[in-house]
Amino acid sequence: MRHEAILRGMTAGLIAAGVMSTARLLAHRAGLIERTVPQVLQERAAGEAGVDLPGGTAAHQLVAEVVHHEVGLTAGGALGAVTARPGTATGVAYGMGIWLIDALGLLPALRVDRVGGRAVDAVAHGVFGAVVAFAMRELAAQPALQPLPTDVPARRRVG
């Protein structure tokens, strides 16, 4: 059963990373930030490696989101290894713990000097944690999925 919780956590992490990215894009639209944390980390990594991706800004944005979703997948799986159905408070606390690692460890280690955006980043991580917890519970509540041959009509409420 533990492996199912880990897989659900990984799935929930992907879902939550997308929601978190959307929250950050809304903050950008509102003029609160210039770039998302994954974009800055990707810029720094590409600069250190001397890599300028073909495709320009769009390619850098894509790589930043792919890496961000991988981190979300990993973080969700780690939570699933600890608990199968985390409550919302647990999820938010987990997201804030990840934010502390990001804010106090990762960004300073990469010599990223923030001139704003800490509150946006903290809220985004809290949202991530809440969504991971919600998605893990909802995924666990779904009926069992199984292969369904195409010659058998599927009558389901699907949305």
PLM segments and residue spans:
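Short amphipathic, positively biased membrane-proximal segments
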Residues: 1-159
